[in-house]
Curated annotation (Swiss-Prot):
Protein name: GMP synthase [glutamine-hydrolyzing]
Pathway where it operates: Purine metabolism; GMP biosynthesis; GMP from XMP (L-Gln route): step 1/1
GO molecular function: ATP binding; GMP synthase activity
Keywords: ATP-binding, Glutamine amidotransferase, GMP biosynthesis, Ligase, Nucleotide-binding, Purine biosynthesis
Highest taxon of source: Bacteria
Broadest EC class assigned to this enzyme: ligase
Catalytic activity of the protein: XMP + L-glutamine + ATP + H2O = GMP + L-glutamate + AMP + diphosphate + 2 H(+)
Originating gene: guaA
A GO term from the CC aspect: cytosol
Length: 501
């Protein structure tokens, strides 16, 4: 296993992803976490926002003295190793963004041109290497960009894990296979069979319950656990009235008919809309929906003799939750059932907690889940309630449902749905003047939103061809009663979030 020690870098998860893309297993830990070194083949120290000379700056983990294997240290990690081994780091002019570096011959740079552009993000710089180290890359400003002792330590001042670094993927694979001599051991088929065995051992002949949303994570978790315990898994699908068009019918068709699951559908549309009446604040809407969802789920769970709660938590959720108390601030409340295990005295099973989203999709494909489910765009837990800006009403939901359906249908028609990470419609709380026939119209405005992203942490607005947008806009204004204007959102994240609320 490759262990990535996270020093607060926004790119730490990317390091783990790049390693797994090479079919080598990797996990993220924090410097103060306990580690079983018997399972560790290689350690990577991430970057971070701190200076190694700050009084409370993160240090090397306690277990690091016992670890004797190869180390790749990136950015802050490089500076930390240099300082700890007797070199010198000091405040420099800083290098940020795309930077040209000149590489020397080294196994980590095999097959890479002598000069490449890399992604820098550092204020401190190494001015003297520890004894036994030599530089293997220098930046255009003369700063040491990489160094090694040729035995155990490889230090990179830049970030090979980001796409902005040319040949970054090659550098990581060179380190894994040329330097560390690791073997590829991260196979989806073996992984799935091992997870099924583990679920059987954990749950046995007992019953488990799962809140099925129809999204990728809960769907894959449901099929995986169903493969292990069959009808002893009770899947609860709550129709809160905030779903996309035909969503409930599709979930019933796939999971009840195709997979023959024990699926319970709860029609709670009236109670959710009643709770949301008059509410306009997005944070209040999210909170109301989350709390009401838990009430509905609890009521249903009491009808079944269950001991386990299955959740579709994935690895990015685990890392963000672990980090949230350390460095991150809350942007939005996330609608989930995280409080249910304690409230209901259920044992928690999270079969996907060590997988990233793309790996979850691979597991889903292996399990035979239809591509239409596997490749679905992300959908917020509060559903259309956070895409109807302002108060949520049945009329507004129906307008948005139809507009969103037309937008997605148009993207699919032109084979563009899978080219964007997420696409949806938003109903704005304003009306605008228009002309329909010979009469004046005063109708709602719909905003279309489409973004490209990897994990949703950052996102760029999608450059959808104008003829596709034109077709969607014409259909929406023609076919959806109450809509007189369509606009396209061209804001990236940051500064905006992907969802409007």
């Amino acid at each position: 296993m490759v262990l990535v020690v996270d020093y607060g870098s926004q790119y730490s998860r990317l390091i783990t992803r790049r390693i797994r893309e090479n079919e080598v297993y990797s996990e993220v830990v924090f410097p103060d976490d306990k580690v079983d070194l018997s399972k560790v083949d290689t350690v990577i120290l991430s970057g971070g926002p701190r200076s190694v000379y700050e009084e409370d700056a993160p240090k090397l983990p306690e277990w690091f003295q016992e670890y004797k294997g190869p180390v790749l240290a990136i950015c802050y990690g490089m500076q930390l190793i240099v300082k700890e081994l007797g070199g010198e780091v000091r405040r420099g002019r800083g290098e940020y963004g795309r930077t040209l570096v000149e590489l020397s011959r080294d196994p980590i740079f095999e097959g890479i041109p002598e000069k490449v552009h890399v992604w820098m993000s550092h204020g401190d710089e190494v001015v003297r290497l520890p004894e036994g180290f030599h530089p293997i890359a220098v930046s255009e400003t003369g700063v040491i960009a990489a160094a090694t002792d040729g035995k155990r330590f490889w230090l990179l001042q830049f970030h090979p894990e980001v796409h902005h670094t040319e040949y970054g993927d090659r550098m990581i694979s060179n380190f894994l296979f040329n330097v560390c001599k690791l073997e590829k051991n991260w196979k989806i088929g073996d992984l799935v069979e091992e997870k099924i065995r583990h679920i059987k051992e954990t749950i046995g002949n007992k019953k488990a319950i799962l809140a099925l949303s129809g999204g990728v994570d809960s769907s894959v978790a449901a099929v995986l656990v169903h493969r292990a315990i069959g009808k002893n898994l009770v899947c609860v699908f709550v129709d809160h009235g905030l779903l996309r068009k035909n969503e409930r019918e599709e979930v019933e068709r796939v999971f009840k008919e195709h997979f023959d699951m024990n699926l319970v559908v709860v029609d709670a549309r009236k109670r959710f809309l009643e709770k949301l009446r008059g509410v306009t604040d997005p944070e209040k809407k999210r909170k109301i929906i989350g709390e009401e969802f838990i009430r509905v789920f609890e009521e249903e769970a009491k009808k079944h003799d269950v001991e386990f709660l299955v959740q579709g938590t994935i690895y990015s959720d685990v890392i963000e939750s672990a980090a949230s108390g350390k460095t991150t601030a809350k942007i939005k409340s996330h609608h989930n059932v995280g409080g249910l295990p304690e409230k209901m005295n259920l044992k928690l099973v999270e079969p996907l907690r060590d997988l990233f989203k793309d790996e979850v999709r691979k597991v889903g494909k292996y399990l035979g889940i239809p591509d239409r489910i596997i490749n679905r765009h992300p959908f917020p837990g509060p559903g259309l309630a956070v895409r109807v800006l302002g108060e949520v009403t049945e009329e507004k939901l129906e307008i948005l449902r139809e507009a969103d359906y037309i937008f997605i249908e148009t993207l699919r028609k032109h084979d563009y749905y899978d080219k964007v990470w997420q696409a949806f419609a938003v109903l704005l709380p304003i009306k605008s003047v228009g002309v329909k026939g010979d009469a004046r119209a005063y109708e709602y405005v719909v905003a279309l939103r489409a973004v490209n992203s990897v994990e949703g942490m950052t996102a760029d607005w999608s450059r959808i061809p104008h003829d596709i947008l034109d077709e969607a806009a014409r259909r929406i204004t023609r076919e959806v009663k109450g809509v007189g204007r369509v606009v396209y959102d061209i804001t990236s994240k940051p500064p905006a979030t992907i969802e409007w609320e």
